[in-house]
Amino acid sequence: MGIPVVVPVAAAYSCSSSLAAPPRAAAAAARAPSRAHVAAAGMSSRASSFVGGSGGDLAAVAASVAARPRRAGSGGGGALGCKCLFGLGVPELAVIAGVAALVFGPKQLPEIGRSIGKTVKSFQQAAKEFETELKKEPGEGGDQPPPATPTAVSGGEEKGLEASSSKESA
């Protein structure tokens, strides 16, 4: 048996489950959470048994806390917590800028910044052109007439052409 770390919280959760199931089933469910609850807590069954002793109350509490709906504003926000570029926050970008300043020096940084800006601008322009071409393609298919196919010449016209060419050569 593991040491009950958060007994009042676990007792509150076991009371709500005891209303729906017999006391023995509720106790068994509290001791051995289902795989879905363990997966929702982000733990494997081996890790849940390590953390909660025999997979007991602590794993059940962790699973119920992980399954709770979160507020919209609590997604790691805050002044320094925004994920701006490729999942990097403000502190990470500041460290990258500091390392770049040390590596390239103050004379080359403006030139590198300009070249990066031009590259980003060209990528944005190419993406915009690609998007407009994708929007145009479905509408263009019905407006254009089908391409002209060459028609076969009938046998009578060929004989007439041969006769006129033989008259000219004679």
Swiss-Prot record:
Any one Pfam family match given in the protein's UniProt record, by short name: TatA_B_E
Renumbered residue ranges of the record's region Disordered: 130-170
Lumenal topological segments: 62-84
Gene3D superfamilies on file: 1.20.5.3310
Organelle targeting peptide span: 1-61
Stromal side: 106-170
Its membrane topology: Single-pass membrane protein
InterPro entries, alphabetized: TatA/B/E (IPR003369), TatA/E (IPR006312)
Gene Ontology terms: cellular component: chloroplast thylakoid membrane; thylakoid membrane
GO biological process: protein import into chloroplast thylakoid membrane; protein transport by the Tat complex
Top-level lineage group: Eukaryota
Transmembrane segments: 85-105
UniProt keyword terms in alphabetical order: Chloroplast, Membrane, Plastid, Protein transport, Thylakoid, Transit peptide, Translocation, Transmembrane, Transmembrane helix, Transport
Localization: Plastid, Chloroplast thylakoid membrane
GO molecular function, one term: proton motive force dependent protein transmembrane transporter activity
Keyword Thylakoid: yes
Reported phenotype of the disruption mutant: Seedling lethality after the development of three to four leaves. Non-photosynthetic mutants possess near normal pigment levels but lack one or more elements of the electron transport activity in chloroplasts. Defects in protein targeting across chloroplast thylakoid membrane.
Compositional bias ranges of the Basic and acidic residues kind: 130-139
PANTHER family the UniProt entry points to: SEC-INDEPENDENT PROTEIN TRANSLOCASE PROTEIN TATA, CHLOROPLASTIC
Function as written in the Swiss-Prot or TrEMBL entry: Part of the twin-arginine translocation (Tat) system that transports large folded proteins containing a characteristic twin-arginine motif in their signal peptide across the thylakoid membrane. Involved in delta pH-dependent protein transport required for chloroplast development, especially thylakoid membrane formation. TATC and TATB mediate precursor recognition, whereas TATA facilitates translocation.
Assembly and interaction partners: In thylakoid membranes, TATC and TATB form a large receptor complex, containing about eight TATC-TATB pairs, which binds the precursor protein. Twin arginine signal peptide promotes pH-triggered docking of TATA oligomers to TATC-TATB receptor complex, inducing a conformational switch of TATA that results in activation of the translocase. TATA dissociates from TATC-TATB upon completion of translocation.
Family to which this protein belongs: Belongs to the TatA/E family.
Full protein name: Sec-independent protein translocase protein TATA, chloroplastic
Protein source organism: Zea mays
Gene: TATA
